[in-house]
Design a protein with these regions (language model features):
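Auxiliary Fe-S-binding modules of radical SAM enzymes
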Residues: 10-30, 186-259
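Canonical Radical SAM [4Fe-4S] cluster-binding loop centered on the CxxxCxxC motif
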Residues: 18-19, 25-27, 31-67
Length: 259
């Protein structure tokens, strides 16, 4: 463990509290989920049923490996110097990490005590589970908004859009930095009117530092087949570059920084 006296005290407290969680996998040097090089923990459990989900194996809450915050913080501590030197930190993703809010809070609290940047990758649907203390340990929220039309959102995800918007507005009120993410799926999320309204909404929030337009890909298709699940997007191809450019331009028209 690192030598700072506060860390063993924190870890001992976590051991006593026995904060457990279910983990799907860990990426030790991620470069896509927040600034710098990051340790990314993918948590199990998700209430959404996104038709284009590339990690359907994370949906089941207890489908992953049971772990505890003490164990995971020890692993983070071993990477601390590298993460700091690469201007990175720790990202919790999923699945939907807010299905395990106590675990998220413990990991982020420990990470902040090590001086590490923290990022939460979430759909926002369970935003009410993120209390103010959890958000105080969160430096950045990667907010995935799947669609801006409520009916289309429900068709794509199986759940309502409003909880995500409520969470977005709460983050705005807190002035919590947000990177908004939007997956562009031909025939499902490519309605330019809806994208324009999403772009205007992102601008009005005032705390969205950047927007990432992520082209749909088929890399998770084999997981659906392996799990014998019906994959609705089997015949859907990845979006053409012109479509991606058009979607990005709607955000750029609102003055947003777009990737």
């Amino acid at each position: 463990l690192p030598q700072q006296p506060v860390l063993p005290i924190l870890f001992e407290r976590l051991m006593m509290k026995n904060v457990t969680g279910y983990l799907h996998s860990v990426e030790t040097a991620g470069a896509l989920d927040g600034p710098g090089i990051r340790r990314v923990l993918f948590l199990n459990g998700c209430p959404l049923n996104c038709v284009y989900c590339h990690n359907p194996d994370t949906r089941k809450y207890k489908g992953g490996t049971k772990t505890d915050a003490f164990t995971e913080l020890r692993a983070i501590a071993r990477q601390k110097e590298m993460l700091l030197s690469m201007k990175g930190g720790v990202t919790l993703s999923g699945g939907e990490p807010l299905w395990q809010p106590a675990f998220v809070k413990a990991i982020f609290e420990g990470s902040k005590m090590m001086g590490l940047h923290t990022a939460l990758d979430t759909s926002g649907f369970l935003g009410k589970k993120a209390d103010d203390e959890l958000l105080s340990f969160t430096d950045l929220v990667l907010l995935d908004i799947k669609h801006f039309d409520p009916d289309a959102y429900k068709r794509v995800t199986g759940v309502d859009l409003q909880p995500t918007l409520d969470f977005a507005e709460r983050l705005s009120a807190l002035k919590k930095p947000v990177w908004m993410r939007f997956v562009l799926v031909p025939g499902y999320t490519d309605d330019m009117d809806s994208i324009s309204r999403m772009a205007a909404y992102a601008k009005d929030l005032g705390n969205v530092e950047r927007v990432e337009v992520l082209p749909f890909h088929k890399m998770g298709e084999y997981k659906w087949e392996a799990m014998e699940m019906d994959y609705a997007l089997f015949d859907i191809q990845e979006p053409e570059p012109d479509l991606v450019t058009m979607a990005k331009s709607r955000f750029e028209d609102e003055g947003m920084v777009v990737f």
